[in-house]
């Protein structure tokens, strides 16, 4: 026991003092924390786990069509404007048919004998023929437009535009041809014959205006 105490005594010449371990060196530039690496694709699974869920909304066919329609037409404004134009064209053609029918009836009624007979004048015969053509064409076009609107089919076509222009040209030429002779007649005498012819000429000009406007609108529709 005495020998063990002697060996452990610090006065012993065999005693060696143990120094504490030195502290770790301090780095002047501490290493930054590892940055978070974002996966390349949200649909690629990491470590064999389930695919990562995303918040994207799938595009259904209805949404795709709506997006295309909004890009090109800006909503339903284009369709409403087209329907409005087609309705105006229908009214104009129906009005042209009515005006042409009344003008045709007035000219055909001018058979009062002697010089008060429209058959004696080439201008009035031409006016009657054009009024018949305008009435048949305008009534047929109005009926066709009405049926197509009920079916929801496409309305305007190049043939409709060209037909409106052609019949409108016939109406204005016939009315203009009958106007000078009628003015001369009315300067001499005013009676039922000259009044009926003057009214039919005025209706011919109105029918021309209706078909000309219909041609312009049908092209834009």
Curated annotation (Swiss-Prot):
Extracellular side: 109-125, 182-196
Annotated TM spans: 88-108, 126-146, 161-181, 197-217
Topological domain ranges for the Cytoplasmic compartment: 1-87, 147-160, 218-221
Ranges where the record places region Disordered: 1-78
Domain of life: Eukaryota
Coiled coil: none
Entry-linked Pfam families: CASP_dom (PF04535)
Signal peptide: none
Pro residues biased stretches: 19-33
GO cellular component, one term: plasma membrane
Record's compositionally biased regions (Low complexity): 50-62
InterPro entries: CASP_dom
Localisation per UniProt entry: Cell membrane
PANTHER family, per database record: CASP-LIKE PROTEIN 4A4, CASP-LIKE PROTEIN 4B1
Subunit structure: Homodimer and heterodimers.
Family: Belongs to the Casparian strip membrane proteins (CASP) family.
UniProt name for this protein: CASP-like protein 4B1
């Amino acid at each position: 026991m005495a020998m063990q105490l002697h060996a452990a005594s610090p006065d012993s010449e065999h005693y060696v003092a143990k120094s504490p371990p030195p502290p770790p060196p301090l780095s002047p530039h501490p290493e930054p924390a590892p940055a978070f690496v974002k996966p390349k694709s949200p649909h690629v699974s990491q470590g064999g786990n389930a695919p990562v869920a995303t918040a994207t909304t799938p595009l259904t066919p209805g949404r795709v069509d709506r997006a295309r329609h909004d890009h090109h037409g800006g909503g339903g404004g284009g369709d409403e404007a087209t329907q409005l134009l087609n309705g105006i064209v229908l009214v104009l053609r129906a009005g042209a048919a009515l005006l042409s029918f009344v003008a045709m009836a007035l000219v055909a009624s001018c058979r009062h004998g002697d010089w008060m007979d429209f058959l004696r004048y080439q201008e009035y015969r031409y006016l009657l023929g054009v009024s018949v053509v305008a009435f048949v064409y305008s009534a047929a076009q109005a009926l066709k437009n009405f049926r197509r609107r009920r079916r929801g089919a496409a309305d305007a076509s190049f043939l409709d535009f060209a037909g409106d222009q052609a019949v409108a040209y016939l109406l204005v030429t016939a009315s203009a041809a009958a106007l000078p002779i009628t003015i001369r007649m009315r300067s001499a005498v005013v009676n039922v014959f000259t009044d009926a012819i003057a009214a039919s000429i005025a209706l011919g000009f109105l029918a021309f205006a209706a078909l000309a406007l219909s041609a312009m609108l049908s092209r834009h529709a």
